[in-house]
Amino acid sequence: MQKESIYGLTREQLVDWFLAHGEKKFRATQVWEWLYTKRVASFSEMSNISKSLMTLLEENFSLNPLKQVIVQEAQDGTVKYLFELPDKNMIETVLMRQEYGLSVCVTTQVGCNIGCTFCASGLLKKQRDLTAGEIVAQIMWVQHYFDERGLDERVSHVVVMGIGEPFDNYANVMNFLRTINDDKGLAIGARHITVSTSGLVPKIREFADSGLQVNLAISLHAPNNEVRTSIMRINRSFPIEKLMAAIDEYIEKTNRRVTFEYIMLSQVNDRPEHAQQLADLLRNKKKLSYVNLIPYNPVSEHDQYSRSSKEAVLKFYDVLKKNGINCVIRKEHGTDIDAACGQLRSKQMKKEKVKNQ
């Protein structure tokens, strides 16, 4: 049976586990420091803990459960990792070099059931949720890469926007957030972490009550129900009116800005009237709204879509700006590698299938 990754425990949970096994609280603190401050690669490197405690840890936990399968490096410094999990499932993680630091995009599920018609992540249906440990391990793998090479760089920003719907794996994602945000561990600031959801309304409300200062992003991608339902199946369950009501509640409770992700699809959602509808939709919350216009990365399986022209994107941007909406055209990363989320995994799974036939 596969042992749980110790990365899956928050500091509080680690302390509770130690106390339940007859160990002192300060031992848990020592182990936590070895994991996240000294960032060791094995329990045997924890030089100030007893042999019996080391054995106890080795019997109950694994450290990093990921196995690297493929690494793609782009000319702009973006690195895309394909990892194999202990059950042979595969996930993707992306490192992006930004002006403000190193940002990592993590995956939260093996596959995705949300079924957005433009997305490579949903080409392979959800097999299971990732554990909190498997999500934390993605950050640790990237950080170890820099540590091992003596590079004085650290992961400073995290976006929970990889394969899967984070709020469909809510409990594990929340434990992941608490672990990486812990000031005695990786200490990645809450305001440097963004969680994206396609619009699971009950979980948006729950997230508003969580007390975490983590940023929220909404994968909106359309300004009206007709267009959104045609490209995002989730809109049937949670139409725009319900989604916006939940966001209004979130803003009222947290007073935090919400980012709206908007993939630009040629002749689908990119016309000036769509931009005006979006501006009207956000008018009552424009002080705490931020629109991220995203150039579409074409996916061969979704050839009904193509990216909007630069002219269409700029016109859309101008309409939003004239309406007082804060917006930006997202800078592209890794365009010379499998840039679309889920693309690398999908390609590799196809290769494996052919190989095994």
Curated annotation (Swiss-Prot):
CC cofactor: [4Fe-4S] cluster
Reactions catalysed: adenosine(2503) in 23S rRNA + 2 reduced [2Fe-2S]-[ferredoxin] + 2 S-adenosyl-L-methionine = 2-methyladenosine(2503) in 23S rRNA + 5'-deoxyadenosine + L-methionine + 2 oxidized [2Fe-2S]-[ferredoxin] + S-adenosyl-L-homocysteine; adenosine(37) in tRNA + 2 reduced [2Fe-2S]-[ferredoxin] + 2 S-adenosyl-L-methionine = 2-methyladenosine(37) in tRNA + 5'-deoxyadenosine + L-methionine + 2 oxidized [2Fe-2S]-[ferredoxin] + S-adenosyl-L-homocysteine
Cofactor annotation comment: Binds 1 [4Fe-4S] cluster. The cluster is coordinated with 3 cysteines and an exchangeable S-adenosyl-L-methionine.
UniProt enzyme class: transferase
Domain Radical SAM core: 98-330
Sites where the protein binds [4Fe-4S] cluster: 112, 116, 119
UniProt keyword tRNA processing present: yes
Record keywords: 4Fe-4S, Cytoplasm, Disulfide bond, Iron, Iron-sulfur, Metal-binding, Methyltransferase, rRNA processing, S-adenosyl-L-methionine, Transferase, tRNA processing
InterPro entries: Aldolase_TIM (IPR013785), Methyltransferase_A (IPR040072), RlmN_N (IPR048641), RNA_MTrfase_RlmN (IPR027492), rRNA_lsu_MTrfase_RlmN/Cfr (IPR004383), rSAM (IPR007197)
Active site: 92, 341
Phosphoprotein in keyword set: no
Example GO biological process: tRNA methylation
Sites where the protein binds S-adenosyl-L-methionine: 164-165, 196, 219-221, 297
GO molecular function, one term: 4 iron, 4 sulfur cluster binding
EC number(s) recorded for this UniProt protein: 2.1.1.192
Disulfide bonds: 105-341
GO cellular component, one term: cytoplasm
Subcellular localization(s) per the UniProt record: Cytoplasm
Function: Specifically methylates position 2 of adenine 2503 in 23S rRNA and position 2 of adenine 37 in tRNAs.
Other information: Reaction proceeds by a ping-pong mechanism involving intermediate methylation of a conserved cysteine residue.
HAMAP family: RNA_methyltr_RlmN (MF_01849)
Family according to the record: Belongs to the radical SAM superfamily. RlmN family.
Protein known as: Probable dual-specificity RNA methyltransferase RlmN
